[in-house]
Every structure is written in structure tokens, then in C-alpha cells.
């Protein structure tokens, strides 16, 4: 029999622990009130004869109290209750000392590998983690209802970002960068007026990105289409200067050449400013800003020519990469690039196909950009095309008072994820039991999400002026609350999920790619989506269904369930759970079949979803990759490529750093295993990671099969 402790761990049942607990209480009562050895034995026998495979520690304690009362040992029962209450108070005390000291001494491996873009050796990152540990502790002990904290500990659900929950800040957003650049903003009490050139616009954009990142915990996105007009301003400025200086001496075509040369230099410098500042800035979160640059063109845009130039330069610089400390060009993790495929650039003879060809070449070498099909996105979002917030979170369509769709300047309140495989384990193939338990746990998730919502309710705009007062999300008055932005679907709040593959395997015995598994998996997805739509109607809050990235959660849920339920083939034995609705990473399936199959699930998971294919080095077979991009445009909303982009600082090896049989990263050329002497970049879960991963995610990365 396994005993499930309060933190979700499963330990072997030990009758001696019951005997010791009762004996301790026995010592504090009068002799005639003590339980005899026979009475203690009867209590133990009763528990053991229940024949349970698993029992909660609280249930054992309840039984002990009940049995002591039955034999009229009231004083002893009272002492036992006091003992139990005292232990509960001890658990309520501060629990952060060991984890914080372990972090400072670099001994807290689990925390160090929680986020692959945070280097816990750095003092600045350690400060963020220390604050995060305090926040987690307060959240668990004081801020969340006990049943939500318990559900989190037992792996029933995951209350994301508890390390920031003590403050009224939110998850991710689409910055209203056009508004801020055109109308000005304020940072650190200083007025920033509308830029007069492209270079200044790029500098201001990076300053905004840093300020925004320091006042939220999730990703942010910037639509680069708003910078086209500033490149035009630079063009007009250069032309005026050169004409004033050389107008009577040079022909117009020579003047135009001079203008273009200066413009190209400014374009290169401006884009370089964005790329290098994002990769060298350190926010208060202890990492570079988690930012996505959205690269798209609109046919009726008066600055389409300039925006095409900006996209081309961004792609060229990303293809080149950024030099590491050894002076070698490597793949940067940020900014994430998302490139939009539309009718004029989908490699079907369109005017801007040349940009897509460059994007594909860049993806083959640097993994970014990822691709959004404008055609498929319009089908899912009422004819609109807009950026994900960060890596994969999508807003729901929303109209302002004039009936105009608005996406920029909106945000996500937070996420709670449900552990689907655990429900499948408990249901043991019984569908009636499964659906009943799923609904019970969905209600728990709703309650946890409402905790997120209530934490933001009543927040004053002064908490983050860059967000609420100076244009990133709104232009509220000082002291005004943000409440109106939390209702009516203006912002979203997300139900995440993980492990559709494992759940289907448990309930149907097959993968979701098999017909029986496919039907069941889709039914589950639709059920989850229906729950969010129902909650949305009940509360007037923008609930949405979101495919959880699960960088550390893929390991956490699997570890908890293995401890509680043992080793289960294709479920807990792997050391990780599969991301959202994705096909098992080990399953042999070709790129086109995988993308087509997963597109059906993306269309349901409209609050957030992304699909990937694993590819070898395609730098000498770009045509094949172009055929995949064409397929993406016609078949799936959002997709990305995973390849390898590594470098060994010891021997200069430029290729794939492998994961050896001991689950360690190792240079195949010289055997170097020192993380500090290698650059490894992998697709973590929608974005790239470069500071290594926890044991579960590392196993998942190792087991990924090629799809092309």
C-alpha cells in the first residue's frame, strides 16, 4: 500500500509510524485514558484490511481519530487532534530556507533547470529566484485556498507562475507599439516623444520591451509593421539633407543612390540595435526579455516597401547569428521571430516570395522564424491575423465601441493547467469514471483561475505605468483601476492542458494517431473547450483553451505520478509527459502527416497552440523545406522547425552536441561535458532555450525522431 503525502509524494505504508504517533499522544494522557497495545493493533489492522492500493495520509489520521473515539479514549483522541494540528502549523511555517540556500550554493538542481533561459549562476538571476521562492511559499501557505494548494502539490493541476503571484502582475501581452511610437510614452518619469528616424524608433522599441518585461512575467510581442513609417521618415530626412547639400551639383539618380546607401546603413544599424539589445539586456526577471517580433505584410499598407526591407534585414541578421564569447556566430534564443505566410508570399509566384525563401533559409540554420498561415488563421479568428503573445498564447477576437477589432494592447491574466494523464491513470479505462473525474477537476481549475483573476481585480494603474498609463496596454489615469480590462473578453485567462497522448494511451491503449484514439482525443479537446466557453458566459471573463508549453511541467507531472502510481509503460516510464495535443515525440510520422493531423487540434485550442517538425540539417536541401512551408500555408495555422545548432568551446566542434547514455550533454568530438564550455540551443517548447533543461525535458529532447 502506498501513502500519499500532502506534497503529492507516494511513500510505502509503514505501520510503525502509526504506532509511534499514537504512543506519543499516549504519553501525554492519564494511564486509564491510554490506548492499549491491542487497541492500537486493531486500528492498524483496520487500516490494512481496507485493502487499498493507495491511501491519503489525511484519511489515515481521520481513521485513527474515529477509532479512538469508538473505544471512548476521548482525552487521547483530543491529544492526537492537537498533535495533528501542531504538525499542520509547522507545515504552515516558512519553508524557503533550504531551497534558497541551495540556490545560492548552486545545489538546487531542480530550480536551476526550471527555465532554460535563466542562468542561475548570475547574481541578478538568483535575486529573481530568491524572490520567487518567497512568493511560492506565501502563495502556498497564505494566498491560495488550501484545496488549490493541495491540488497543485498532488499534481492534479499546476498553478503557473506562483513565483510572481504575490504581486498583481499578469502573464503575456501584445504591446501596442504603434500607439506608443506615434503618440509618445513615458519611462521612468521621462517623456519619450514620437521618433523622427528609424534608428531612434528601434532604440525606443527596445527600451519599451525592457520596461514591459520587467513588469510582467510572461512573453510579449511586437508587430514590426509599425516601424515602416519611421524608415520612410529616415528616407525623407536623408533625401532632404543630400538635396540641400548637393542638389545643384548631382543628378537625381546619384542623389537617390546616396540616399539609399545611408538608408541601408541606418536600416542595418537599427535592426542590429534591436537584436543585440534584446540579447544583452537583463530585466528584473533575471533573463533577457522574452519577446517575439511579428513579421508580416499587408497589401494596403502605405509602407509595405519599407516593411519588406525591415523584414529582409531582420532575417539576414538572424541568419548570420550573434557572436559568442569565442567569437563564433551562434543561434540566439531571442527575439523569437514569427513570419506570416499570405497569398503574396506563400511560394506560389507572389511578389514577396523572395522574403519567404530567405525565411526558410534562415529557419534551416537558426530554427527561427516560425510560420503562421494567414489563410488558416483567418478561418479561426473571424478573418483576423495577429501575433501570438510570446510563444503560443492567442487572444480571442474582441471589438471596441466602434465595432473595430483590436488585438494590440491586450493581455493574458494567467494560466492553470490540468494533468490529463493522472485522470486517465485513476480512471483505469472506465470512461464514465473518467468524464466524472475530469469535470470535478475542471471545476478545481476554474476556481484556481478565478484566484488569478481576483488577484488582479482592484489593481491600480500605478503598479506599472508603462503598461497601464503610457500605452503598452492602456492609457488609464493615475490611481485608476484596471478592472474594466479584466472583463468582457478584453483580456484572456487560460485553461492549459498536457498529455493528450498519454491520456489516450491509458484510456484506449493506442496513440491519438490511431482512429479510436483520434476520436477520443478530439472528444476530450472539445470537452475542455466547451468548459472554457461555458465559464466565459457565466463570468464575462475571457476564458480560453491553451496548449501548455510545459518546459518544466512535462517532468513535474510525470515525476509526481510515477511516485504515486508507479511505473506505467508509455506514460510514467518515459520521465516526461507529451506537450499539449502533440504526437508522441518517439512516433515515426512524416512531416506532412504530422502537421495535417495536429492542425485539427490547433483549431480547437484557440487560446494557444503550436506544432513542430523535427528536421536534420537542411542547409543543402532548402527546396524540401520550402515544400513544407507551402504545405503549412494551406494546412495549419502555426508551425515551426526544430534542428540542431551547437558549438563546443573546447575543440571548436560545430554540429550537434549529443545527449549520452547517462542523459548528459556531450561533445561527440572531444567528449566535453562542461555546460559552461559549450553552446547548445534547442527548441524547448515553442521558443528556444540555451541554458540547458531539467532531466525530463532532456529525455524528451533525446527521444525526438526526425519527421523529414
Give residue spans per PLM region.
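Core of folded catalytic or high-affinity ligand/protein-binding domains
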Residues: 477-478, 485, 489, 495-496, ...
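Contiguous, well-ordered alpha-helical segments that form the cores/surfaces of helical PPI scaffolds
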Residues: 493-506, 526, 683
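Buried hydrophobic packing segments
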Residues: 18, 22, 227, 231, ...
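Long insertion/accessory domains within large nucleic-acid-processing enzymes
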Residues: 669-708
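Short, solvent-exposed positions on alpha-helices
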Residues: 34, 55-58, 491, 515, ...
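Conserved catalytic cores of very large enzyme subunits
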Residues: 86-90, 96-489, 510, 514-680
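Charged, amphipathic alpha-helical regulatory modules used
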Residues: 1-107, 702-707
